[in-house]
């Protein structure tokens, strides 16, 4: 297992955010989590990524207990909500800076993904000139460019055109075959049907069932 959640709960101002969630994620699979807005999907990803503390329970990533605010033992690729890039810097400069912060930056995978998503013609432009779709593709590249073994994607198809969505889904299937684990959150159940090995429903902070 690359991820294990054991009876994880979280409340904010008395409101249930996550309620007694237990979940195990295997390597080399794509998991989908769907539900209406406000059901807790994004908060679950934030907890796994270590971006949010929990009130009770435990989260293990690659066998290591997740501690809020502490860098994990493995690199996690994350697209949660809007990624804040430096608007006055080029897309490529943003990727380079992020890569260097995380460790030695091998730009070969980033360049491959830029070419794959047809971003070559604007990657050297300032990010503040990007459309929402261009910004979303840049966010996806930063989450995948270091061949992270665990990838958490919150509504990754937002603002993407049909061709880019198809490319993304094909790429995620490729990553699965390479043994990487992907968690995709969407409020659209049908978007996950073809892509995922297993799907879960969230409602009012609770995780329900699973479908293979």
What are these regions (language model features)?
Residues 34-36:
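The feature captures the beta-strand-to-loop junction immediately N-terminal to the Walker
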Residues 49:
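Helix-to-loop junction immediately C-terminal to a conserved catalytic motif
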Residues 57-72:
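Conserved ABC transporter NBD signature motif
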Residues 96, 107-122:
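Conserved ABC ATPase "signature" region
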Residues 151-155:
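Catalytic Walker B motif of ABC-type/P-loop ATPase nucleotide-binding domains
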């Amino acid at each position: 297992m690359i991820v294990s959640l054991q009876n994880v709960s979280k409340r904010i101002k008395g409101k249930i955010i996550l309620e007694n969630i237990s979940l195990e994620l295997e390597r080399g699979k794509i998991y989908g989590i769907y539900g209406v807005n406000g059901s807790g999907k994004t908060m679950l990803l934030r907890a796994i990524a270590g971006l949010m503390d929990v009130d009770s329970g435990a989260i293990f990533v690659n066998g290591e207990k997740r501690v809020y605010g502490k860098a994990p033992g493995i690199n996690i690729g994350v697209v949660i909500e809007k990624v804040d890039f430096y608007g006055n810097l080029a897309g490529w400069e943003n990727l380079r800076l992020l890569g260097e912060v995380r460790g030695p930056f091998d730009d070969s995978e980033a360049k491959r993904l830029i070419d794959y998503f047809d971003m070559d013609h604007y990657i050297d432009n300032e990010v503040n000139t990007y459309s929402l779709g261009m910004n979303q593709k840049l966010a996806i590249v930063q989450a995948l460019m270091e061949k992270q073994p665990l990838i958490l994607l919150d509504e990754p198809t937002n603002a993407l055109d049909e061709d880019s969505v198809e490319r993304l889904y094909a790429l995620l299937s490729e990553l699965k075959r390479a043994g990487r684990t992907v968690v995709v959150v969407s409020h659209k159940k049908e978007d996950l049907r073809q892509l995922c090995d297993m799907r879960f429903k969230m409602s009012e902070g609770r995780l329900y069932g699973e479908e293979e």
